[in-house]
C-alpha cells in the first residue's frame, strides 16, 4: 500500500541560523557578541580598515560587500581570530555553511576557548547534518559552561536528529524559553517525548504551537508530528483548531484525509477526497491518496482508474506512475507492468526510483538479466538509494550470483547509516544458502536478524524470521514472542498468522491456534 506523507515543514532550518548569526554579529553584550567593534583601530592599518568597513556593510545588510571586505582583512591578517570569526558569521548569514565552518575552525585553532565561535560552529555543523562533529563541539562547550542555553538547545536538536530521544527530551526540556521561540524546536521536543512514551507531555508541547508567531503553519507542523507518531486524534484536533483561520481549505481537507488514511479510516478519507474532486480540486496528489484508499479497501480496479487519471492530469509526476506500477505488480499483471516500465523510463530517464520500479517488475517477470541492468542503473543514478541496493542484491541472488549478492549487502551495511534493512535482506539470502547445506549460514542469518531488530524493532519481517527459526527448532514459546510482535507490526501477513497457528498448536493452545488459522485462510485469499 502506498503511504503518502507530506514533506516536513522546516522553518527554523531555513532561516534560524541566519538570525542566530545576525544576533551573534551585532549584539552589544559581551557574552553573545561575535566581534568587538573595532573602535581603537589605527587609521593606517589596512586590515583593520577593511574589517571596519566590512562590519559597516554587514550592519547595513549588504552581506556581499561585507563578505568582500572581510576577506581582504583576513588575507592581510590571517592570524586574527576576530576577523576570521566575523567572516565566518557573514558567510553563515549568506548560507555558505561549508565555507563558514572552515573559518570558524581556523578561528578556534587560534582561540580554542571562544565560547561564541564554538557555539556557532556547532550550529553550522548541525545545519550541514554533520551531527557527530556538532555533538563533539557542543560537548566541549558544555564542559566549559554547563548551563549555556544555546548549546543545550543545539545539543537537543542534534540528539533528536540522531534519534537519541532520551537525551533530546531531557536537554530541550531544560531550556523551555528557547524551545518556545521556534516551532521547529517545539516539534523536536514533542517528537522526542512521543518516542520515549511521554505522550501527555508531547501533546502539551504541541498545544504550545497555537501561541507561535508562525500561526497556522506552526499548528500544521504540530498536526504532522502527531500524525507521524500515530496520535491521530491529536492530529485531527490540531487541524480542526485552525479550520476558521486557514485560507487554504483545500490543503486543510487534504491533510485531514491524510490523517484519516494513516488511521486506517479509509472510507472517511475517501469521502473527503471525493468531495474535493467534486468541488473541482482535481490534483495528482488527491488522486494518489484516493487510489491508496481504494487499494486499502481492496478496490484495485478503482485505484488503477484513479491513478491513470492522475497520470493524464500531471504526466510529469513520476509518483503516480510508481504507485500504478506497485498495484500492477501486486496483482501480477506483469505484461501491463512491463509496458508501464518502458513508459516510465522514457519519461524519466534520470530517475533512480523509476529504475528501481522497472527492476522490481523485471524481477517479478523472472527476467533477472534485465533486472540487474535496471538496478545497476538505479545505483549509478543515486548511490545512496537503499531500495536500489536491495533490489540489486535480490537480482544477483535470483540470477544465481549469491556471493555477489552477499558482497553487495555487506558493503551496504558498512556504508549506510540505516543498516537494518540490509541486515534483514542479507539474513534472508543466507537462509536460502543454508537450505543448500551451508550450516554456518543459518547462524549468521540469525545474528543478522537480531542485529536488524536492535537497529529497528519495527521490522516485522525480521521478527517473523526469528520466530520461524525458533519454531523450526522446536522452541515454540520463544517463537511465539517474535511471531506475536510480527503480527502486531504487520497484521496482514498471512504467513505470520500461519506460523502463529503452528506455535499455538504446539503449546496446546488450540483455540488460539484455530483463530490464527482462520485469519490465515482469510488473508491468503
Predicted region positions:
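N-terminal leader/linker segments that initiate helical-solenoid repeat arrays
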Residues: 29-71, 75-76, 80-86, 93, ...
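Structural marker of alpha-solenoid helical repeat scaffolds
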Residues: 76, 110, 144, 177-178, ...
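Canonical tetratricopeptide repeat
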Residues: 86, 120, 154, 188, ...
Amino acid at each position: 500500500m502506498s503511504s503518502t506523507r507530506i514533506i516536513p515543514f522546516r522553518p527554523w532550518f531555513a532561516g534560524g541560523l541566519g538570525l542566530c548569526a545576525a544576533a551573534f554579529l551585532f549584539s552589544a553584550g559581551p557574552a553573545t557578541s561575535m566581534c568587538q567593534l573595532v573602535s581603537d583601530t589605527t587609521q593606517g592599518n589596512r586590515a583593520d580598515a577593511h574589517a571596519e568597513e566590512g562590519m559597516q556593510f554587514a550592519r547595513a545588510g549588504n552581506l556581499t560587500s561585507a563578505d568582500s571586505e572581510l576577506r581582504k582583512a583576513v588575507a592581510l591578517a590571517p592570524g586574527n581570530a576576530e576577523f576570521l570569526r566575523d567572516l565566518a558569521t557573514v558567510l553563515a548569514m549568506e548560507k555558505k555553511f561549508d565555507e563558514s565552518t572552515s573559518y570558524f575552525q581556523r578561528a578556534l585553532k587560534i582561540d580554542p576557548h571562544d565560547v561564541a565561535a564554538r557555539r556557532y560552529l556547532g550550529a553550522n555543523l548541525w545545519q550541514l547534518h554533520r551531527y557527530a562533529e556538532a555533538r563533539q563541539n557542543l560537548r566541549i562547550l558544555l564542559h566549559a559552561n554547563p548551563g549555556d542555553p544555546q548549546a543545550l538547545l543545539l545539543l537537543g536538536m542534534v540528539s533528536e536528529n540522531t534519534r537519541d530521544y532520551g537525551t533530546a527530551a531531557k536537554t530541550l526540556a531544560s531550556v523551555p524559553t528557547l524551545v518556545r521561540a521556534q516551532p521547529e524546536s517545539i516539534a523536536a521536543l514533542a517528537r522526542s517525548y512521543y518516542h520515549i512514551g511521554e505522550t501527555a507531555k508531547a501533546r502539551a508541547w504541541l498545544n504550545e504551537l497555537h501561541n507561535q508567531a508562525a500561526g497556522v503553519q506552526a499548528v500544521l507542523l504540530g498536526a504532522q508530528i502527531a500524525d507521524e507518531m500515530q496520535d491521530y486524534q491529536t492530529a485531527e484536533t490540531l487541524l480542526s483548531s485552525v479550520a476558521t483561520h486557514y485560507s487554504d481549505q483545500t490543503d486543510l481537507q487534504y491533510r485531514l484525509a491524510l490523517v484519516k488514511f494513516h488511521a486506517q479510516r479509509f472510507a472517511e478519507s475517501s469521502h473527503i477526497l471525493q468531495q474535493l474532486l467534486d468541488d473541482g480540486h482535481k490534483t495528482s496528489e488527491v488522486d494518489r491518496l484516493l487510489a491508496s484508499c481504494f487499494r486499502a479497501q481492496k478496490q484495485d480496479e478503482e485505484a488503477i482508474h484513479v491513478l491513470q487519471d492522475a497520470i493524464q492530469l500531471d504526466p510529469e509526476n513520476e509518483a503516480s506512475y510508481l504507485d500504478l506500477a506497485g498495484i500492477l505488480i501486486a496483482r501480477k499483471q506483469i505484461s501491463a507492468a512491463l509496458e508501464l516500465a518502458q513508459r516510465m523510463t522514457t519519461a524519466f530517464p534520470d530517475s533512480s526510483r523509476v529504475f528501481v520500479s522497472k527492476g522490481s517488475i523485471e524481477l517479478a517477470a523472472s527476467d533477472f538479466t534485465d533486472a540487474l541492468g535496471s538496478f545497476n542503473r538505479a545505483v549509478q543514478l543515486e548511490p545512496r538509494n537503499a531500495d536500489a541496493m536491495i533490489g540489486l542484491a535480490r537480482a544477483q541472488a535470483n540470477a544465481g550470483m549469491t556471493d555477489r549478492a552477499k558482497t553487495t549487502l555487506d558493503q551496504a551495511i558498512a556504508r549506510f547509516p540505516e543498516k537494518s534493512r540490509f541486515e534483514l535482506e542479507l539474513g534472508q539470502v543466507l537462509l536460502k544458502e543454508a537450505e543448500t547445506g551451508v550450516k554456518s549460514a543459518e547462524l549468521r542469518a540469525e545474528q543478522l536478524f537480531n542485529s536488524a531488530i536492535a537497529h529497528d524493532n519495527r521490522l516485522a519481517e525480521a521478527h517473523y524470521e526469528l520466530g520461524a527459526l525458533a519454531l523450526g527448532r522446536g522452541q515454540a514459546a520463544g517463537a511465539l514472542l517474535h511471531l506475536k510482535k510480527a503480527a502486531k507490526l504487520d497484521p496482514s501477513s498471512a504467513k505470520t498468522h500461519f506460523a502463529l497457528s503452528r506455535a499455538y498448536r504446539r503449546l496446546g493452545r488450540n483455540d488460539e491456534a484455530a483463530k490464527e488459522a482462520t485469519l490465515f485462510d482469510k488473508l491468503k485469499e
